[in-house]
Amino acid sequence: MTSSSPILKQTPKFLSALEGQSHANPPVWFMRQAGRYLPEYRAVRATAPDFISFCFDPEKAAEVTLQPMRRFPFDASIVFADILLIPGALGQKVWFEAGEGPKLGDMPSVESMAEKAGEAGKALSLVGETLTRVRSALDPDKALIGFAGAPWTVATYMIEKGSSDRSGARTFAYQNPETLDALIQVLVDATIDYLAMQVDAGAQALKLFESWAEGLSEPLFDRLVTQPHIRIIEGLRARGVTVPIIGFPRGAGTLVEDYAARTPVQGVALDTSASAKLGQTIQKTKTIQGALDPLLLRAGGDALLKRVDEMLEQWNQGPYIFNLGHGILPDTPIAHVEAVLERVTGQKVGQ
């Protein structure tokens, strides 16, 4: 297996930040930067019959991945896909309903899913085709990020069949610990294979999205978040994958510091609640990423630019990647994105 994508003449700023370097103007990208706030995205999305088909169309997915790179001076591009592709690869039906979000069918037995976990990369090879298309079109100084939903977060959707109420999954964790641990391990194995495929296809960095880390007790957080992340990273390294990895335990609060200390990630993405001190503490050993509130980005005005300045002042003395604390909202004005990017890059952006 290829341990990393082809060597480029210039190390992208995003990757150098993950190596621990600081920059006068930090690298910047936004979660969900390819999305509905862009009219060009909406135009392409309208040509796909449904969201899953959209994710599995390499031509369309590559196009929307590249759209924000053409419009804005982002330093990294993240492949357009979804965290719920892995359940489909394991045999659970996944679909999206307009205005309601993801829906999942009955979860197959853990035993049947375990048989498919080692073939997740093959089952999701169309995402690899998207990555290859994007990498060939990206400027050499721009980095390409692959990603996956982390096991606990994916498991919550699989257990609750798409419900946004995590209480059912937490209750399942208490009542069925052995079954949940087995499911988490299946997802660890599938995620390793899926992410290794993404690196082979051109991803230069990886991100684990633990979107539902909030509300877990310290013992549950260790069992369902920290330990599975460690196993994924160790599994990738054992397969020769050397690219940097960012972990995003969203909503974990003070447990993020322990997560950063114990997991072998190179970067830790912070959510909007992260304090200046928390970020500075983690920066002593890791690169941090984040953590502008998407609601503030949408609101705009003086408060937005003031917060951008605060974040740069408190975190840009160490290795730092400017980003949001969650995905960009669909009704975010493009002018607000441009204003933030002007402030971060020090360059004129937009018209």
Curated annotation (Swiss-Prot):
One of its GO terms (molecular function) is uroporphyrinogen decarboxylase activity. CDD domains: URO-D. Its EC number is 4.1.1.37. Transmembrane segments: none annotated. Belongs to the uroporphyrinogen decarboxylase family. NCBIfam families: hemE (TIGR01464). PANTHER family: METHYLTETRAHYDROFOLATE:HOMOCYSTEINE METHYLTRANSFERASE RELATED, UROPORPHYRINOGEN DECARBOXYLASE. Substrate binds at R32, Q33, A34, G35, R36, F51, D82, Y157, S211, H326. Homodimer. This is Uroporphyrinogen decarboxylase. Pfam families: URO-D (PF01208). Pathway: Porphyrin-containing compound metabolism; protoporphyrin-IX biosynthesis; coproporphyrinogen-III from 5-aminolevulinate: step 4/4.
